[in-house]
Regions:
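Bacterial N-terminal signal peptides
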Residues: 8-16
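Gly/Pro-enriched, hydrophobic low-complexity segments
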Residues: 86, 97-101, 107-111, 117-121, ...
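A short, amphipathic edge element
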Residues: 28-31, 63-65, 143-158, 207-212
Length: 269
């Protein structure tokens, strides 16, 4: 099973043990080795973490968001994630819920307290910005799913090896095959020793990336490495979203009721 690992909101893709470097390996074999780690050494059932998001626009403006993220894994590679915004006042009480499915688009809902209404994110709205950040609703789904995509989801190829921030990495190109995915290709830099993503680039029709994601400041929570600093950049807009993670904890025996749509209005437990 190709288990999805989280960014974010984090996204949150994780790695642990050092694999043996095999020069003859294909991209698929590398991704399968990562999957094996996710199902053994790095396996977890649920998690929570605090996130601080700083959104910088192309004109020099800056906004901050504080939120709590809760997530659980289900059999068959399914995930359920809920996010509660805590500050500032204009977004406090906003909540987001996602059911991530293997091989198909996620189901997503957004609760807006000023409207006292929960709306499901329609397919046509998945490329819209997620609460004013550099991430779209579809990006949240892709970042969780992509390292576990099958060959039916995306063609994979190994472009070589590069060093990112002093870390040797595999450079893997993914070409999505599903019509619901907006990007023409995604390039992923995976740490050679821990298979932890260090960089992502998302491409449309042009030769330059439309979005870049960089992960840094990795630390272990038990056997699970977590990126405490993530930057998401949209070059054409000159904007950047910085995500800082703290207080990450795994296997907390979270109540399944926390992941129902009615929990969006109830708020953080």
């Amino acid at each position: 099973m190709r288990t999805r690992q989280a960014f974010v909101m984090g996204l949150l893709l994780v790695g642990a043990v050092a694999p043996i470097l095999r020069a003859e390996e294909t991209a698929r074999q590398i991704l399968d080795r990562r999957e094996a780690l996710d199902d053994t050494t790095r396996k977890w059932t649920d998690r929570r973490e605090h996130l601080r998001m700083t959104v910088r626009d192309g004109r020099g403006g800056e906004r901050q968001r504080e939120l709590m993220l809760y997530e659980r894994r289900l059999p068959g590679g399914e995930r359920q994630t809920i996010v509660f915004f805590e500050s500032p006042a204009e977004v406090k009480g906003t909540a987001f819920l996602a059911y991530t499915h293997k091989g198909q688009p996620a189901e997503q809902w957004l609760y807006l307290p000023e409207l006292k209404r929960t709306r499901q994110i329609a397919p046509r709205s998945r490329t819209e910005s997620f609460v004013g950040t550099d991430l779209t609703y579809q990006d949240l789904d892709i970042i969780q799913e992509m390292a576990a995509w099958s060959d039916d989801d995306a063609r994979s190829s190994l472009r070589g090896q590069e060093t990112v921030d002093g870390v040797p990495t595999y450079v893997i190109e993914l070409v999505p095959q599903r019509p619901d995915i907006q990007y023409k290709k995604i390039v992923l830099w995976l740490g050679r020793d821990d298979l932890m993503p260090r960089r992502l680039e998302f491409y449309g029709d042009a030769s330059e990336p439309v979005k870049r994601v960089q992960q840094a400041d990795l630390h272990d929570v038990g056997a699970i490495p977590v990126a405490r600093h993530v930057e998401v950049e949209t070059p054409a807009k000159g904007s950047k979203t910085v995500i800082e993670s703290s207080d990450a904890a795994y296997d907390q025996q979270l109540d399944e009721a926390l992941f129902r749509t009615d929990a969006l209005e109830r708020g953080k437990p």
